[in-house]
Amino acid sequence: MEMLASFEPQLHWFYKWWIQLFAESEGKEDQGVYPISGEYSEELHSVGQFLQDGSPVIFETFLHVKDPQASMIVHPDGCVKDDFDYLNGKDFREINEATYGATLRAHSEKMPCMVLEVEKLTPYSFGEIFYFFMYTCYVSAGILGVNPFDQPGVEAYKKNMFALLGKPGYEALRQELAEKLH
């Protein structure tokens, strides 16, 4: 399994695309690396536990944005005593950067970790990231000996779905599935 992880919330939908790209392109003929994503720091505590002490079946790729554009300062809340006062006045960028460094160090002691770094998230850098992953997917599929451009596994469920929903041309399969499902 490969986990693509980042501390950048703007990458949420990018993760979905990345998972689809690699799962659909490599996941055939009993080949491929199962792609998953980690949206840190949100999932760091739960997923981090598995990464630190669970089965060693994962390698991790960090997509690190050196200069995130968003900025927010932690302000004191006099109503709640939660032992997080030491964070008052700190920018979330500083907190995320420290958490990234701590996470990379801890995880790299347990599993292979790689870092892909971009300066900022701009339309140009997004283009670079998309191109990088599309090209690496193409190359890795070639190494695995699979065609990254077909999707036979997807076709199986689509045919069943078409039959069950009554799409013309799928009548025989619909009858076969009806007998199996009841």
What are these regions (language model features)?
Residues 1-182:
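A SIS-like phosphosugar-recognition module
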